[in-house]
Amino acid sequence: MAVSVQDLLDKIHFHVIYSTETALQKEITTSEIMRPGLEMAGYFDYFTPERIQLFGMKEWSYMMTVVGDNRYDLLKKVMAKETPVVIVARNLEIPSEMVAAAKKSDIVLLQSREATSRLNSVLTSFLDERLAERTTVHGVLMDIFGVGVLIQGASGIGKSETGLELVKRGHRLVADDRVDVFQRDAFTLSGEPAEILRNMIEIRGVGIIDVMSLFGAGAVKDSTDIDMAIYLEYYDKEKAFDRLGNAPTIVEFSDVEVPQTRIPVKTGRNVSVIVEAAVMNFRAKQMGFDATKTFEDRLTDLISHNKES
């Protein structure tokens, strides 16, 4: 996976000091950002030129104390040909030697008004997301009450129809049929649609539906974190289903664990309403209210009361 410098410019606002068409096509292959403090002092033993080079106040201040050809010689080493882009934060002045070094190595040179730590965070977050390894899962990804919900189940069970009904009830579609899943950080899983299927739902017997055209921009979302999974399965009276909600299932995607609720489907059940209830119950548990525990406490109190009687 790689991100071009042009992709970075399309996403984050910078003032371009120097660029060329070839420099804009250079690839960023890591989300780690280099702040070349020791390098400006001449120590290059662990220098990693393939990273973005970010100059903050400290690096810039030291650079400005170096004068004459020494400054240019240092900058030529820091701004190596392998370096994809050099960024100067805080709208700090760009010395002519830095522009000359950028031209020498054909590197895009950018300036940002953002504080260095803030810019570092924005860059890392963007690159982590874009460079993350993606896997494809079959299902419907929705934003329901602000919760990212991945709806899965056997083919033909009604996942897309449930998603369409949820859109009609005011929730937002992220992806239908193919969901591209990626790990945004160590504990967060996110999902987005395949570009060709963005804003689309396929309903058997009807065909492809453009959700944004029919229901408006508020009915779709580009991506969402996956907070819970719901699995639709055909009702089987011989199979035991969780009736109290005290036996949660955990599924794993890309090494991230996600709580799963399994919902039996049969004629006459309003699946979209049940999905909404499952999501609201999930939110309530996150807020500290557990209806199952409340019921168990009441049952324990009732049994104790009957024994005393």
Curated annotation (Swiss-Prot):
Disulfide bonds listed in the record: none
UniProt note: domains: The Walker A ATP-binding motif also binds Pi and PPi.
GO biological process assignments: regulation of carbohydrate metabolic process
Name assigned to this protein: HPr kinase/phosphorylase
Ligand binding (Mg(2+)): 160, 202
Gene behind the chain: hprK
PANTHER family: HPR KINASE_PHOSPHORYLASE (PTHR30305:SF1), PROTEIN YJDM-RELATED (PTHR30305)
Catalytic activity, EC: 2.7.11.-, 2.7.4.-
Oligomer and partners: Homohexamer.
Function, in words: Catalyzes the ATP- as well as the pyrophosphate-dependent phosphorylation of a specific serine residue in HPr, a phosphocarrier protein of the phosphoenolpyruvate-dependent sugar phosphotransferase system (PTS). HprK/P also catalyzes the pyrophosphate-producing, inorganic phosphate-dependent dephosphorylation (phosphorolysis) of seryl-phosphorylated HPr (P-Ser-HPr).
